[in-house]
Amino acid sequence: HLDFRRQRQMCIRDRDLGVSSFQFDSPERGFSFRFDERLDMRMNKDAVLDACDLLNTYDEGQLEKIFSQFGDFKTVESKRITSKIIDARDNNKLTTTQDLVSCIEFLVPQKVKNQFLARVFQSIRIEVNQELNALVEFLNQLPKVLKNEGIVSIITYHSLEDRLVKNFFKTGNCNGDLEKDFFGNISKPFDLVNKKPIVPGDAEIKLNPRARSAKLRIAKKRK
């Protein structure tokens, strides 16, 4: 993410969150279970922690937490995933994407395997890159770098991101807590341009299936 504290105020700001198609389609980056490559998942190649390190060093509680929080798995599901990972790494270090896939893919029926694996990989990727922390920092900096009546548009690709953006635009904070000034007016820096998120239509999804989960939210900074 960018450090907006060093930038001049802007009139328009666009933000497309998440991993790019280029990164997903680059086997050596380790973002996708479609390829058998090293577990990496770092957006910043200079970062110290990668997916391989995470999976082989995080303890049981840490792993359960990331699958529960970032994959939206139920507690029992997070425990099962974690148990299989720990059993596998006790025998051999998890090094490649297929090492991970092979130890957990049988936990669910074949018909939902891809969705299941996508959520597992998403959980690990979010933790490796501290994506939600970066998004919160970005949102908190917006009122300082966007001019009055400036426009900001953000595209999210999963519910965790979208919840943070939705809350911030509606209330001015990522928790979604309404704060009022001395006169009882809601104190928030932005007004919604579109009350509901803009989502792709069937034609766009057919052309680009990865757009299926995308949501576009637009807000305008108050004077």
What are these regions (language model features)?
Residues 75-86, 121:
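Short, well-structured alpha-helical segments
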